[in-house]
Regions:
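Hydrophobic helical membrane-anchoring modules
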Residues: 1, 179-239
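Cell-envelope/extracellular polymer assembly enzymes that use nucleotide-activated donors
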Residues: 2-5, 43, 176
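Short, well-formed alpha-helical segments that are part of the catalytic scaffolds
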Residues: 12-33
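A conserved acidic beta->alpha catalytic loop
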Residues: 48-56, 96-97
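Glycine-rich, basic loop-to-helix element that forms the pyrophosphate-binding segment
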Residues: 68-84
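Short aromatic/hydrophobic "clamp" motif used to bind/position activated sugar donors
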Residues: 89
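Conserved donor NDP-sugar-binding/catalytic core segment of glycosyltransferases
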Residues: 100-129
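Acidic donor-binding loop at a coil-to-helix junction in glycosyltransferase catalytic cores
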Residues: 171-177
Length: 239
């Protein structure tokens, strides 16, 4: 049984973070101090790219460690991982919403000799027809390509280190990591969903948001620099 360090990059998203931390602290067996002994959540590390006092206060309310950092998701994840003490690592975005018992699902995968895995992508919203089309398409993309960081990537600490860790980039920071993990062993999809906030799809439009995301992924695959892609992302979408 593993102890998990949860690492959460955040940037001006205190409302969503409050909900997520509340869910994490309400999981079966989780202590308010984050010390569980042989299994469960050992610690929660929030890496704040905005260096915001509000974020720090939210972390204090839920006994999460607050770490300021430059606003670059890859750098934030690296900073959080450098402080993590758990035998396993679980990376969550601040706007993620959890299934009932994610720790048990991850434990089962690791006990079956997986090096890590990811949760099924599902929008946290009433079932609109665009979501019903996009969710299976995303599942297929994950199997033939790379699951992204909003799907709750988890892995053993050793596998993370052996795979090379996150890239220090603002976008696509998990791509090399996931590919490295798959070379090491089984990186498995879980049946359990992680619920994704659809607010950005609502603001930008379902198909416009999807089109921009796919174009960025194609540009990255062709060798475009992540820093330049991040600038393009911010110019075309509502962050």
């Amino acid at each position: 049984m593993s102890s998990f360090s949860v690492v959460i990059p955040c940037y001006h998203d205190e409302a969503s973070l409050t909900t997520l931390l509340g869910q994490l602290r309400s999981l079966p067996g989780t202590s308010s101090q984050g010390v569980l002994g042989v299994q469960g959540i050992l610690e929660i590390i929030v890496v704040d790219g905005a260096d915001d006092q509000k974020c720090r206060e939210v972390c204090g309310q839920y006994d999460a460690r607050w770490v300021p950092c430059e606003p670059c998701r890859g750098q934030q994840l690296l900073a959080g991982t450098a402080l993590a003490r758990g035998e396993a690592l679980w990376f969550l975005h601040a706007d993620a919403r959890l299934p009932p018992d994610p720790i048990l699902a991850m434990e089962r995968a690791l006990e079956q000799n997986a090096v890590g895995g990811y949760f099924r992508f599902r929008f946290d919203a009433p079932r609109a027809w665009p979501a019903l089309l996009l969710e299976p398409a995303i599942a297929l993309r994950c199997r033939v390509g790379v699951p992204y960081g909003d799907q709750g990537l988890f892995m053993t600490r050793r596998a993370y280190m052996d795979a090379g860790g996150h890239s220090p980039w603002p976008l696509f920071e998990e791509v090399a990591l996931v590919r490295g993990l798959r070379r090491l062993g089984r990186f498995v999809p879980l049946h359990e969903p992680l619920f994704i906030d659809p607010r950005r799809w609502h603001r930008d439009g379902w198909w416009r948001r999807t089109w921009v995301n796919r174009n960025l992924a194609l540009a990255f695959a062709r060798g475009a620099k992540p820093d330049r892609l991040a600038d393009r992302y911010r110019s075309k979408t509502t962050i």
